[in-house]
Amino acid sequence: MTRVRRGYIARRRRRKIRLFASSFRGAHSRLTRTATQQKIRALVSSHRGRGRQKRDFRRLWITRINAVTRENGVPYSRLIHDLRKKQLLLNRKILAQIAISNRNCLYMISNDIIK
């Protein structure tokens, strides 16, 4: 069996890994094996971070809505329950933006729903 020289393909693969890892520190950007491992770790961390980001933003929106609606005497859970009951399709992101930019509008929404 003849020997296969993997010159171009191997160089292309390593160059792609080096390009990805060029911003890493120390040997993680220079050595192929450690750069490959760090690339895998970076991709795993970014995947995990995207899921965590969704959770964190949802928590932030809920906190903002709750802070504004409690000033009006309505807890967050009751507001969301009444929104669902009246079939108003306002998600938490939009409600949080309304709570920050225009509190009176959110007060009007909550007063209309609760009645």
Curated annotation (Swiss-Prot):
Keywords: Chloroplast, Plastid, Ribonucleoprotein, Ribosomal protein, RNA-binding, rRNA-binding. It is found in: Plastid, Chloroplast. GO terms for molecular function: rRNA binding; structural constituent of ribosome. It comes from the Eukaryota. One of its GO terms (biological process) is ribosomal large subunit assembly. The keyword Chloroplast applies. Its main location: plastid. The keyword rRNA-binding applies. One of its GO terms (cellular component) is chloroplast. Belongs to the bacterial ribosomal protein bL20 family. NCBIfam families: rplT_bact. Binds directly to 23S ribosomal RNA and is necessary for the in vitro assembly process of the 50S ribosomal subunit. It is not involved in the protein synthesizing functions of that subunit. HAMAP family: Ribosomal_bL20. This is Large ribosomal subunit protein bL20c. The lineage of its organism: Eukaryota, Viridiplantae, Streptophyta, Embryophyta, Tracheophyta.
